[in-house]
Amino acid sequence: MAPSWWGRSGGGGVGNGGGTPVVVKMENPNWSISEVEAAEVAPGSPAGAGKAGRGKNARQITWVLLLKAHRAAGRLTGAASAALAVASAARRRVASGRTDADAAPGESTALRARSYGCIRVSLVLSLLLLAVEVAAYLQGWHLEEVASLLAVDGLFAASYAGWMRLRLDYLAPPLQFLTNACVALFMVQSIDRLVLCLGCFWIRFKGIKPVPQAAAAGKPDVEAGAGDYPMVLVQMPMCNEREVYQQSIGAVCNLDWPKSNFLVQVLDDSDDATTSALIKEEVEKWQREGVRIIYRHRVIRDGYKAGNLKSAMNCSYVKDYEFVVIFDADFQPQADFLKRTVPHFKGKDDVGLVQARWSFVNKDENLLTRLQNVNLCFHFEVEQQVNGAFLNFFGFNGTAGVWRIKALEDSGGWMERTTVEDMDIAVRAHLKGWKFVFLNDVECQCELPESYEAYRKQQHRWHSGPMQLFRLCFVDIIKSKIGFWKKFNLIFLFFLLRKLILPFYSFTLFCVILPMTMFVPEAELPAWVVCYIPATMSILNILPAPKSFPFIVPYLLFENTMSVTKFNAMISGLFQLGSAYEWVVTKKSGRSSEGDLVGLVEKHSKQQRVGSAPNLDALTKEESNPKKDSKKKKHNRIYRKELALSFLLLTAAARSLLSAQGIHFYFLLFQGVSFLVVGLDLIGEQVE
């Protein structure tokens, strides 16, 4: 028989007696108390009935509370297990780490050692100062004036008084001057960012977008009007990019354009014989399908990508083509790409370049790709679109763009003098008076670097090259015939503010000056510079990618962390150091952009394999390579500069506690943790 407290009868509960009935829903896994209701004790009931009922109810409540406690303990255990798993994974990744990450093929060992040594000396000095400040804080001397400290007996008190006088008279004034200068640069750059965002808002509000005078895309039958389509040359430079060549070649060969009016050049600079054989076989397969496609492999591989493109443009048949389209090896254009870009040249003889924006197939792969997506969305949505709409000039992105061949030739063609040949040709074309068009609604999908090592090398090239180019073309800009405001935009905004000042103040202000002001509190860095303005700028940066809003704090911290790499790259490019000439092909993973596109490529591949004999040597090598690759182990790289800066910032955070600077403390703490995560290579994928 069920106990009396199990349910409630119509007679008013437990034998119509007193007590506090408790209904427990047993089917509820939460074991929650669903009803606790006091009932009046019926007249004439035994005196102990109420107490007995309350005793039983108390026991039931105890059991429910115990079950809740058990569940809470289970949650804590799960959280602890997850934390241990993360710590264990971090330990394994760190244990397999390599400390050669800071090495660059062209960088001198002495220069690299000096850079790391300066950071290490700063760290040791900050630790010593922290120990001194803690001891002085315990003595209460941080509240005393220098004169009162001199009256205190003891060597330590006199030494600390001398340190305070040194700070006040000699260290604080120049540090405050440098702080004010960096804050001024920070404000100028923030105003520039705000103006760009206002320009983007105006473009959206007014619906401003480039409109072609005549759209070839309106014709339903491609072959019917082939004579109305201009001749287009498609170039695909690649180098040892085995993971992506097949899908990118397939995407280009399926472009919706009369086959007689476009030619594909696969410009293979691979030094791996197996990769070259596979690419050549893929080209031959599409040739048998009727596509006009040519395979080119240079014997003398000089000049990197610029040399490859320059060699291809020297072919005799190039004179028969009016436009040239460039796709890097990981880019997968939509079938209507040419129909949406080439018409913008018609009737506009002064247009030299039409640039499409990038989209990314792996933007949600990990935290690193998400943060890159925020940066590049702002770059295309705001910077490129605004500059294209109002100035008719922006930096060519190196791929997913259509050039008028006449504009290339008029600008001097491709040059190998820097590692940013795309920006080089864009600046020279702008100086010749050519106009650029940016199409924000035409996207070409590609990959983002998934490992920090690959991303770091890419960013080094992207930030050292512009400084090389600025040195080389500064005189040409001054002597050019373009207007004063175009010269001002090119020199001050395009090069100095966005390529030099931005990485300079980011590193100097947040990684050098801010920690120093903690140990020299007489020099002040306002809280609005540390927190409020950067937060506002981060919100503006993340607006073009609203789905990434939850990552706004990691984005802000990661951008400051990357300032070390960007600052080093800027210095190497400005002073022509060895690492400024380093060119490393960004590692690809071979992710597909569209399922139907891949299916189409696979369909053609299957048909071709049935009807033709494969290259047995290439296939044999291809089958043997996975076995070799399976033996490769992924490992982490240890970045010593980032680790040293992490400990420096954490030390400064501890010092800020003594000054009761809350905002500075939290910023330094989280920024130090961010440097630690990056220094241990715990962001992004591991490298093989």
Curated annotation (Swiss-Prot):
| GO cellular component: a single term | Golgi apparatus
Any Pfam family from its record, for instance, is Glyco_trans_2_3
Q: Tell me the GO BP annotations in alphabetical order.
A: cell wall organization
* Sorted UniProt keywords: Cell wall biogenesis/degradation, Glycosyltransferase, Golgi apparatus, Membrane, Transferase, Transmembrane, Transmembrane helix
User: Which Gene Ontology terms cover its molecular function?
Assistant: glycosyltransferase activity
Region Disordered, annotated ranges: 1-25, 604-635
Taxonomy, superkingdom: Eukaryota
Protein's name in the database: Probable xyloglucan glycosyltransferase 7
Origin species, per record, is Oryza sativa subsp. japonica (Rice)
